[in-house]
Amino acid sequence: MRPPPRSRTIYLLPNLFTTAGLFSGFYAIIAAANGQFVQAAMAVFVAAVMDGLDGRVARLTNTSSEFGVQYDSLADLVSFGMAPALVMYHWSLSALKYDSSVMGRVGWSAAFLYAACAALRLARFNTQVGVVDKRWFIGLASPAAAGLMMSFVWAFADDSLGFDGEQLRYVALAVTVVAALLMVSRIRFWSFKGGARGPRADRVPFLALAIATVVIALLVIDLARSLLVIGVLYALSGPLMWLWRRWRRVPELP
């Protein structure tokens, strides 16, 4: 006896989350073009939430597919590659043109560098699925890089700290270039996943749950600034662990 066909509504569900994330990234670009930078940054974080949900929904409903994987990757390129680059450019990097025409080109080149590195990072991730240790990301994940970029914009775009994008243009340039290079680096970043296989493969370690509790408390106190602190600490964690491992390495005997 043949099993009943799976409902198309269930099959479409994970792709609807992906579409919602894609819409959020597209909206971020539109909002930035209209000078609504806080809304643009928030939209990218909404896209990150949708990106975290679509894969889990697909696994829970047993509706994972190659189409969904490819669609998710393309949506990520818009939401975590193009959108953060354009938001940062409109908010701050475009102001470099007031220094000189050369610096103006440096500004949009940095934005392009970020978008290109995000594309390379996503392509590398797709080719390494099932090959690398799930406990680690090789290079800063594109959602984390986008979070670093957008938390920086969000923290200062509301003018509560007394700085605007034009004043912070060189800091923004550094943040953009560093985030781009970290994505294509070989530095390992903790993925917050365990190393188990089988049904327990996606379970989150207890330490990650403890960290999440602290993070939630910080987010309640000051959302924008807390996201920036978290983004900076996570971006630094990979290089610091790399330096620690090199320092601890015992030199070989001649």
Where are these regions (language model features)?
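Alpha-helical transmembrane segments of polytopic integral membrane proteins
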Residues: F26-I29, V46, M50, P84, ...
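Hydrophobic, well-structured mid-protein blocks that either form specific transmembrane helices
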Residues: S109-L148
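C-terminal membrane-associated helical module and adjoining short loops/tails
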Residues: M1-R2, K134-P254
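Helix-coil boundary and interhelical linker segments in multi-pass alpha-helical membrane proteins
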Residues: Y27-M42, P84-S109, F152-V171, V220-A224
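Topogenic membrane-insertion module of multi-pass membrane proteins
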Residues: M1-G52, M241, R245-W247, P251-P254
